[in-house]
Amino acid sequence: IGFVKHDIENITGTTTMIFDVNQLSIDKVVLDDNEPTQFVIGNYDDVKGSPMEVTVKPETKSVTIYYSTQPNSKALQWLAPQQTAGKKFPYLFTQGEAVLTRTWIPCQDTPQNRITYDATLQVPSNLLALMAADNNPTEKNTEGKYAYTMDIPIPTYLIALAVGDLEFQATGERTGVYASPVLLEAATYEFAEVEEMIKVTESLYGDYQWGRYDILVLPTSFPYGGMENPKLTFATPTIITGDRS
């Protein structure tokens, strides 16, 4: 349960703005200074979900959508404790590619649309929350509240989230590894040379443009070899071989 606020520039003066949604429960939509507005959710398609048409004004500057996700959201992967390496705490990770971000955020879910964002998350205090963005924490806090910023325009499928019993170990000034405590030592050894790899690449192709480059080692149920989420690659634990290959 939460909300998303879209800051917009209504260049054409349209009175209808269309968002992509897929099996989301929409509570209400408001414009600018909390002004309620009408919305209509169109016909459902198994792949694309539904168009959500929101009534706006030519002068509208923001559209805020209050909503909740569903247990069957295709982008949200919920794992029970026994499905994790540590076996003690549940785990959540998202996978937005190709058009699944609309199953957890009402948005214009196409690669043509590049967005920046700020996000605030509230999670249980015994878990750590990460996003593919700036300001990722390196340790849990007692409030379980975290804030993030992505100031480089990205397609919506690269909005990524992970929540679990995670710890961090730096591998360089701008690189590090997040993993379950039982995997952290092995993961840190495996990726210890990432900072040097970046430096070599920069000597050939120019400066790395994204600030930090961290790696999150996910549970074995992660269905990809890796996902190129900006600033925080999501990686399968099967690449931890012990020989840095």
Q: Predicted segments — roles?
A:
Residues T37-P58, F93-R102, T236-S245:
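Aromatic/His-enriched, Gly/Pro-containing loop or helix-boundary segments
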Residues I1-G13:
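Early extracytoplasmic/domain-onset interaction patches
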Residues I1, D32, L79, A85-Y91, ...:
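N-terminal, polar/Ser/Thr-rich
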